[in-house]
């Protein structure tokens, strides 16, 4: 279990203090995979480094497995850190040591004998699918294999908590997918509490149970992953979820959008589907009820856990008088609708 209570962190700078984290409250339950997402500079790395006190908060408490780390002496804190594994974006492997030796290194520092070390390292090589690479040096490993070594090394002290700091950012999409599947397997087999930070919503969507959205050092939204996708409340959460579903207005139309309604032209809408609304013919009913001309620009349906979510971009022609009633109808049916803007008939004709 991980808990942050009222954690604040400020860095000193020539022009005054820089607030990295402000009054952070966060709880990761035992066995849970919890994601923190935010843009670059949001404070993600500072947050995760506060968990094991690589960065010490200016105020607030950090609690891991019921132990208040912020009150511990240096000696006791070092012992407590053995229960916390950490994986970074960069692998930080020792180039002159094999995969086995890199994984074993923390145990050697703890004074374990070779027999004890072997009993721990061999199962981890198997768990991370590295048995065939036991004697390989980092220069002989792919990026994904290096990250697997780093993960095994983080697990070698039998931690209850695993901290992952942008661990897939340096990997290609296929390798990222395999590493995330490994992380899910580790969570299932070892029942670890996993806290991961990322700027990629695809990572959150793939592995996290719950997610917090971090913006300018503050948690602005927190929810289970499915609920966040269904009903994002903040603008930054909406941007993350919309970018993940990969439905985007063509640039030629974005450049021609106007904010005011037009007598002759098109209204461009983004319509979000969730739950049963993704599986019922609501748009067909909408077209018939209001006798509309509808152009579907883009549409996508995805399945997340046991739910379906989707998004559609549509252009409605000459709807100045009926648009408010149409949006109210769609909202009543459980759809979320956002008016992106308006395009004149001439601009539409020459798109």
UniProtKB/Swiss-Prot annotation:
The organism's place on the tree of life at top rank: Bacteria
Residues in ABC transporter domain copies: 2-241
Primary role: Part of the ABC transporter complex MetNIQ involved in methionine import. Responsible for energy coupling to the transport system.
Name of the protein in its database record: Methionine import ATP-binding protein MetN
PROSITE patterns according to UniProt: ABC_TRANSPORTER_1 (PS00211), ABC_TRANSPORTER_2 (PS50893), METN (PS51264)
MF GO annotations: ABC-type D-methionine transporter activity; ATP binding; ATP hydrolysis activity
Family: Belongs to the ABC transporter superfamily. Methionine importer (TC 3.A.1.24) family.
């Amino acid at each position: 279990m991980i808990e942050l209570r009222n954690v604040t962190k400020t860095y000193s700078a020539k022009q005054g203090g820089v607030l990295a984290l402000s009054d952070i409250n966060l709880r990761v339950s035992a066995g849970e995979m919890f994601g923190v997402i935010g843009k670059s500079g949001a404070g993600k790395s500072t947050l995760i480094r506060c968990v094991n006190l690589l960065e010490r908060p200016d105020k607030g408490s950090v609690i891991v497995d019921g132990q208040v780390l912020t009150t511990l002496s240096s000696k006791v804190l070092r012992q407590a850190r053995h229960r916390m594994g950490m994986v970074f974006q960069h692998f930080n492997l020792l180039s002159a040591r094999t995969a086995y030796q890199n994984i074993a290194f923390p145990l050697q520092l703890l004074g374990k004998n070779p027999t004890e070390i072997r009993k721990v390292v061999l199962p981890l090589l198997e768990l991370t699918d590295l048995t065939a690479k036991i004697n390989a040096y980092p220069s002989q490993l792919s990026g994904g294999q290096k990250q697997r070594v780093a993960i095994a090394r983080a697990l070698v002290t039998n931690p209850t908590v695993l901290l992952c700091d942008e661990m897939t950012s340096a990997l290609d999409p296929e390798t990222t997918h395999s590493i995330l599947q490994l992380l899910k397997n580790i969570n299932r087999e070892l029942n670890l509490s996993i806290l991961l930070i990322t700027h990629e919503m695809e990572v959150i969507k793939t592995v996290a149970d719950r997610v917090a959205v971090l913006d300018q050092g503050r948690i602005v939204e927190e929810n289970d992953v499915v609920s966040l996708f269904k009903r994002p409340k903040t603008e930054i959460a909406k941007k993350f979820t919309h970018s993940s579903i990969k439905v985007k207005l063509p640039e030629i139309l974005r450049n021609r959008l106007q904010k005011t309604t037009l007598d002759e032209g098109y209204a461009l809408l983004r319509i979000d589907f969730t739950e049963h609304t993704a599986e019922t013919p609501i748009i067909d009913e909408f077209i018939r009820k209001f006798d509309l001309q509808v152009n579907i620009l883009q549409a996508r349906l995805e399945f997340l856990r046991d739910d379906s979510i989707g998004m559609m971009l549509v252009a409605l022609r000459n709807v100045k008088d009926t648009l408010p009633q149409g949006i109210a109808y769609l909202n009543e049916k459980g759809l979320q609708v956002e008016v992106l803007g308006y395009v004149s008939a001439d601009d539409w004709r020459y798109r």
